[in-house]
């Protein structure tokens, strides 16, 4: 469970990362996938992560302290927004590559995918990148409340096929609106952190 959560800092590059040994779970996904809402649902704080009406605007890693230093959630910029300049996309890719490959604190990644849609090329590349570097990853399927049962069963299969899903990974369907499976996400965080 998350009993306490607070924003610590935003970092545009490695020099601004927090230098300690506290474990981190990174959250990443396309712009407007529901990442900020997911953080707010996890922490039971609707004001913690700002929900932007301007997708693709944030180019910073946002660090959140959980349970007074037990671990951190790291909110990565949303990717795949067409109106962002190519130079910013390249800067984002370099920053995330550096973070994912070299960040010793990183224990795993929650990759958020919209259950309503086929994964984009960016989604597929992100998942395969994480697998290539042996970074533990959990797929979080968002916006469950927007689909009927027969739709989300069919769409989960479609998403898994599109990203070439590895069976050893966890795939969980959530709704930020009605908190479906949010408790299960705490279990997956503990699993990534190495807790029993």
UniProtKB/Swiss-Prot annotation:
Residues 21-195 form the EngB-type G domain. Coiled coil: none annotated. Keywords: Cell cycle, Cell division, GTP-binding, Magnesium, Metal-binding, Nucleotide-binding, Septation. Its cofactor is Mg(2+). GO terms for molecular function: GTP binding; metal ion binding. It comes from the Bacteria. GTP binds at residues 29-36, 56-60, 75-78, 142-145, 174-176. One of its GO terms (biological process) is division septum assembly. Mg(2+) binds at residues 36, 58. The keyword Metal-binding applies. GO terms for cellular component: cytosol. Signal peptide: none annotated. CDD domains: YihA_EngB. Necessary for normal cell division and for the maintenance of normal septation. NCBIfam families: GTPase_YsxC (TIGR03598), small_GTP (TIGR00231). Belongs to the TRAFAC class TrmE-Era-EngA-EngB-Septin-like GTPase superfamily. EngB GTPase family. This is Probable GTP-binding protein EngB. It comes from Mycoplasma capricolum subsp. capricolum (strain California kid / ATCC 27343 / NCTC 10154). The lineage of its organism: Bacteria, Bacillati, Mycoplasmatota, Mollicutes, Mycoplasmataceae.
């Amino acid at each position: 469970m998350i009993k306490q959560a607070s924003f610590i800092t935003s970092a545009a590059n490695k020099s601004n990362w927090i230098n300690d040994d506290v474990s981190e779970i990174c959250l990443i996904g396309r712009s407007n996938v529901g990442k900020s809402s997911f953080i707010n649902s996890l922490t039971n704080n609707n004001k913690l992560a700002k929900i932007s009406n301007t997708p693709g605007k944030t180019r910073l890693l946002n660090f959140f302290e959980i349970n007074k230093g037990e671990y951190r959630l790291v909110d990565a910029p949303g990717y795949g927004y067409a109106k962002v300049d190519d130079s910013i996309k390249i800067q984002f890719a370099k920053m995330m590559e550096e973070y994912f490959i070299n960040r010793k604190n990183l224990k795993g990644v929650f990759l958020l995918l919209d259950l309503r849609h086929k994964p984009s090329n960016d989604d597929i590349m992100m998942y395969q990148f994480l697998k290539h570097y042996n970074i533990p990853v959990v797929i979080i399927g968002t916006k469950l409340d927007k689909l009927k049962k027969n739709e989300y069963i069919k769409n989960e299969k479609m998403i898994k096929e599109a990203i070439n899903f590895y069976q050893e990974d966890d795939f969980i369907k959530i709704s930020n609106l009605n908190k479906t499976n949010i408790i299960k996400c705490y279990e997956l965080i503990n699993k990534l952190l190495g807790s029993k």
